[in-house]
Amino acid sequence: MHVKAKTVALGGLLLALTIVFMALGSVIETSTLFLLAAASFFVGIVIREFGLAAGGAFYLAAVLLGFFVAPNKFYVLTFAAMGFYILGIEAVWRWLSKRHGMQKRHLIFWIAKYVVFNIVYIPIVILFRDMLFAQAVSDTMLLVVIAGGQIGLFVYDRAYDYVQAHIWGKMRGRFL
């Protein structure tokens, strides 16, 4: 298999930026989620430019390299969850794009987004309850946190769509 030089160069550049954003999340504590979200958006850029296999390899490389380089390993796990979501929705999008006869593909895509997110989010909130919260949390409060996550997903997903369509759409020609 031959890999084009541009693919390797851009992939390496985006991987370096991903790791820098993960590390900066530890330095600039007030912008941690923003920086981790931005780092995870690079997974989507690689998938859209070079395919799902390259995106999966990029994601795996970013997580492994993040564990070696990033000072806060919890932020690497957060990035891993965000990147997994991007990987999952891009895989669903590619699968749905091949199903032209399927009705309501947009609705199915939105449902799939929430399914992929909740496959990761709900077990983390329930299993790591003591680690995530400073004190004991009631079941009602846990449901509020889960509902808040759904709102957070909506904002994160809208930001991802904006970055892909507008920001990367304008910068794409300069890199490729």
Residue ranges and their predicted role:
Residues 1-54:
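Hydrophobic transmembrane alpha-helices
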Residues 18-22, 66, 85, 113-121, ...:
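Alpha-helical transmembrane segments of multipass membrane proteins
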Residues 52-57, 99-107, 138, 142:
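Membrane-helix interface segments
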Residues 8-13, 34, 56-60, 76, ...:
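Hydrophobic alpha-helical transmembrane segments
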Residues 79-122, 126:
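Short helix-perturbing small/polar motifs within transmembrane alpha-helices
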Residues 4, 140-176:
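Alpha-helical transmembrane segments and their cytosolic interface
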Residues 127-140:
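Membrane-interface helix termini and inter-helical loops of multi-pass transporters
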Residues 23-32, 63-91:
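Interfacial aromatic-anchored transmembrane helix boundaries in multi-pass membrane proteins
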